[in-house]
């Protein structure tokens, strides 16, 4: 048996061992993921690359602290420093979006939307949202999601001829179904939202108006997209995507009564202890988004998206609604005789990361699809500009045109050639170097 003196002198590696020493398998996985992010061109519209400061905050000792409740009103002691972090996050979010109230505790986009439902609706109430097949989101009433199981979802859609939302039809539908809540926002809609008209429609039927700006919040923060905050009763957003922060949620409102309901819905309604390390990282990201260079970043996202869309159109690809006014686009692959799943795999093999996506009135199943969704936030963060995105568009077209001529959905020679050129591009724009 070792003596107590020997125990006291034994190094305590729990506080000193590196990840590589403590868990080499996970360390290798992280190293591999860093390599993937460095050497591939990230075109998934919902992804971005955070700053080293955000990484540092999220990996901090604040992960150790439980803090049920809100700043100054916690159920645990020792919360003085996490109170500082959460208060900074709240105040910065309010300043960034011009809102009077902000809740920074939602752990995810799904939970932030669930909190609004819990705060403003009763099970069985009717609400309206954009159909998932037309560019909406699972949490806006998909039958497989809680929002579609616990509530009555009435979906509006887009016109067949131009793939745009018909606001007159939204008004007619609202008058017919008398929803308690109307949601604007989605995951694959590339054109502006008429927030003023949506609010007028909501008011005409006595409904709340909610905007889920998860995808375009960074563009709102950067001043290149209209803000929904002056029009909506409540606005939700994730803190990653175009906002370029850690993965999480944020709820904004200018109504004090709604703010109180939202706070109660988050805690104790849906969540217990908030993730204080993530909230600290949110605060860092909000500060970054308040800087003048973030406006330049947001402007570049949109310019790059338009350049990518126009390049693809120039190579014979159809873009849903004819183009984009934000950070994303849907590519209709049907004229090329391609499917989304096959196209996604070919592009990933070529170093171009994207996702298959349904298009409006898509005849294919969700795991097949007739489209691709492409976005520019992550690669814009790296420093790619219009010239580089024109190159990216040409590379995408080269791969897909080759795959369209292949009977087995692959073009190894072209894919390998494109992958080398992708590597040359990404080497010019390193991350975390």
Curated annotation (Swiss-Prot):
CDD domains to which the protein is assigned, alphabetical: SHMT
Catalytic reactions of this protein: (6R)-5,10-methylene-5,6,7,8-tetrahydrofolate + glycine + H2O = (6S)-5,6,7,8-tetrahydrofolate + L-serine
Modification type N6-(pyridoxal phosphate)lysine: residues: 241
Cofactor: pyridoxal 5'-phosphate
Enzyme class, first EC level, given as a word: transferase
InterPro entries assigned to the protein according to its UniProt record, in alphabetical order: PyrdxlP-dep_Trfase, PyrdxlP-dep_Trfase_major, PyrdxlP-dep_Trfase_small, Ser_HO-MeTrfase, Ser_HO-MeTrfase-like, Ser_HO-MeTrfase_PLP_BS, SHMT-like_dom
Residues that hold (6S)-5,6,7,8-tetrahydrofolate according to the record: 132, 136-138
Gene Ontology CC annotations of this record: cytosol
Pathway: One-carbon metabolism; tetrahydrofolate interconversion; Amino-acid biosynthesis; glycine biosynthesis; glycine from L-serine: step 1/1
Any GO BP annotation: glycine biosynthetic process from serine
Any Pfam family the entry gives: SHMT
UniProt keyword terms in alphabetical order: Amino-acid biosynthesis, Cytoplasm, One-carbon metabolism, Pyridoxal phosphate, Transferase
Family to which the UniProt record says this protein belongs: Belongs to the SHMT family.
Oligomer and partners: Homodimer.
Protein name according to UniProt: Serine hydroxymethyltransferase
Organism, as annotated: Afipia carboxidovorans (strain ATCC 49405 / DSM 1227 / KCTC 32145 / OM5) (Oligotropha carboxidovorans)
């Amino acid at each position: 048996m070792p003596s107590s003196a020997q125990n006291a002198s034994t190094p305590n590696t729990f506080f000193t061992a590196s990840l590589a020493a403590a868990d080499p398998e996970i360390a290798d996985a992280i190293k591999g993921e860093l390599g993937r992010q460095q050497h591939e061109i990230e075109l998934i519209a919902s992804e971005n690359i955070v700053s080293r400061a955000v990484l540092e905050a999220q990996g901090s000792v604040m992960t150790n602290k439980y803090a049920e409740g809100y700043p100054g009103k916690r159920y645990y002691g020792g919360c003085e420093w996490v109170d500082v972090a959460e208060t900074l996050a709240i105040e910065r979010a309010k300043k960034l979006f011009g809102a009077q109230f902000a809740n920074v505790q939602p752990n995810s986009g799904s939970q932030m939307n669930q909190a609004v439902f819990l705060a403003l609706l009763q099970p069985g109430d009717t609400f309206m949202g954009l159909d998932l097949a037309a560019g909406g989101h699972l949490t806006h009433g998909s039958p497989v999601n809680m929002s579609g199981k616990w509530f009555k979802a009435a979906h509006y859609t887009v016109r067949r001829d131009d793939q745009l939302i018909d606001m007159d039809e939204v008004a007619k539908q609202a008058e017919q179904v008398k929803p308690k809540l109307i949601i604007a926002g989605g995951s694959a809609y590339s054109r502006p939202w008429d927030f003023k008209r949506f609010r007028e429609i909501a008011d005409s039927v006595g409904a709340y108006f909610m905007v889920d700006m998860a995808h375009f919040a960074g563009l709102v923060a950067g001043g290149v997209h209209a803000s929904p905050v002056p029009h909506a009763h409540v606005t939700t957003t994730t803190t990653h995507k175009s906002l370029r922060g850690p993965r999480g949620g944020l709820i904004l409102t200018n109504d004090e009564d709604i703010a109180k309901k939202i706070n109660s819905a988050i805690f104790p309604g849906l969540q217990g202890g908030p993730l204080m390390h993530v909230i600290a990282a949110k605060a860092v990201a909000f500060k970054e988004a308040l800087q003048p260079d973030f406006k330049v970043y947001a402007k570049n996202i949109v310019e790059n998206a338009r350049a990518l869309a126009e390049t693809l159109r120039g190579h014979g690809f159809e873009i849903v609604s004819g183009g984009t006014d934000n950070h994303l686009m849907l590519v209709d692959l049907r004229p090329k005789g391609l499917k989304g799943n096959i196209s996604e795999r070919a592009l990933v093999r070529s170093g171009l990361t994207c996702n298959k996506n349904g298009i409006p009135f898509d005849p294919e199943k969700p795991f097949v699809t007739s489209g691709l969704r492409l976005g520019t936030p992550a690669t814009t963060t790296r420093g790619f500009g219009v010239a580089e995105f024109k190159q990216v568009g040409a590379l995408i077209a080269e791969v897909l045109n080759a795959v369209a001529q292949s009977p087995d959905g692959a073009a190894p020679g072209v894919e390998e050639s494109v992958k080398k050129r992708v590597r040359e591009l990404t080497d010019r724009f390193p991350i975390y170097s």
